[in-house]
Amino acid sequence: MTQADNQNPKPMVLIILDGFGESDETTHNAIKEANTPTLDKLFRHYPHTLLEASGRAVGLPDGQMGNSEVGHLHIGGGRKVPQDLTRIDAAIASGEFYENPALIEALEKAKALNKAVHILGLLSPGGVHSRDNQIAALVELAHRCGIKKIYLHAILDGRDTPPKSALLSIEKITDQFHAYGNGKIASLIGRYYAMDRDKRWDRTEKAYDLLTQGTAQFHALTAKEGLMLAYEQGNTDEFVSPTSIHRHNETPITIEDGDVVVFMNFRADRARQLTYAFLDDHFTAFNRQVRPKLSAFVTLTAYAKDIHAAVAFPPLELHNTLGEYLSARGYRQLRIAETEKYAHVTYFLNGGQEAPFNGEDRLLIPSPKVATYDLQPEMSAVEMTNKLVEIIQNDDYDLIVCNFANPDMVGHTGDETATREAIQVIDDCLKRIITALQSVGGEALITADHGNAEKMFDEKTNQPHTAHTSNLVPLIYVGREAQFCKEVGALDDVAPTLLYLMGLEKPREMTGRNLITLK
């Protein structure tokens, strides 16, 4: 069936409110505290249900909070997708990790040349971009291989973990180095610098110069001392300035010709810029004063097709995702988001497919250039809505997928007032989108990829809560008379439900289920 044969409403708009979780808790809940007349009306008058967006429901370990990458993979995939975190942890448990060909080959090169192995990675138990147990497993593997010079360049979290929580991970890995009698943490830097994904290359340059030249704002004898120094400066883990760890009479440990680098982040989006700085022969984003000629550069997972590195855990291929399935049937699609979430409504929603499918257009709205988004909680939501309303009225597309980044990106700052303002901006944008849809006979499914903004303070740590949550997320249908089933669904049910509303059978690859019945 093509859209020409289908009399279902057009366009269908899938609206993803990034970081918008459901919680009965009203204290420190920016969503409940915000003035949201549009959302209140939608929940009162339109069918809605709740979806699981964490743990096993999205291919993660029990209790592991969801994230944007995983959320969009499941929304677009319509099936349970084993996540890299789960795959790599399983490989460690089974022993396969210690026989991984890409890792073994790189380590053997370092051993043969008597060169150093430099481990880059987010040293964090967060499980969103990395997990510290996996870094520890690589340290163990390097030790087993007889590597004498093992250096960890620790990127600190404080975003998917409490703002000041890095010490435990630092102490654990330091104890491991001491037990082996070789290796050390060579540098510290906050993810704000080392893991930018919005082409703020001045931040990436600071990380690159720390790694290749030892250019540091601070120097410390130990990693713990370096962390305490950052806290004294008023910085939380995320914002730790470039810090070199070495004795006062020694030169900083840097990545040199012949060395091996292993980047231990399993999530690609925030690992790409730093990787390009090392590997791109035509790199122009900043002037690389030093470019080491490496024996090997290994990435834990595949970061991008144009990044030519050995990959320890290649991606699983997904076929007949929502985008691919609709494309094959001649449907026209649009993906629209601002910079911070553009990859999620394109690459991740398409199951790791970089190029658009036939009939799929993409529109990128630039995110504002501010240090942190609490300074501009509206981000680019209004500009995106202006374009979206215009596009809806032009009636060019069968399916439009858009992502509002504000609840997640502002929620990550831990600023409750700013996050509340962000929610209120989104509420006003939703009103305009729904009004435009109803004027042309279109419909909407509104959901989220994971929670965040509904929990802004952590009573246990007595710190602002900047991480995602494991809460359920909403699914609201704005269209014809319908009823959701009583059971709680999951994110992989969104695509089958959407296809049902568009008058289509789901493909056999989609194991998620339709959650709604039209009356």
From Swiss-Prot:
Residues at the catalytic site: 68 (phosphoserine intermediate)
Organism per entry: Coxiella burnetii (strain RSA 493 / Nine Mile phase I)
Reactions catalysed: (2R)-2-phosphoglycerate = (2R)-3-phosphoglycerate
Family: Belongs to the BPG-independent phosphoglycerate mutase family.
UniProt: substrate binding residues: 129, 159-160, 191, 197, 267-270, 341
Keywords for the protein's UniProt record, in alphabetical order: Glycolysis, Isomerase, Manganese, Metal-binding
Name of this protein: 2,3-bisphosphoglycerate-independent phosphoglycerate mutase
GO terms under cellular component: cytosol
Residues at which Mn(2+) 2 binds: 18, 68, 449-450
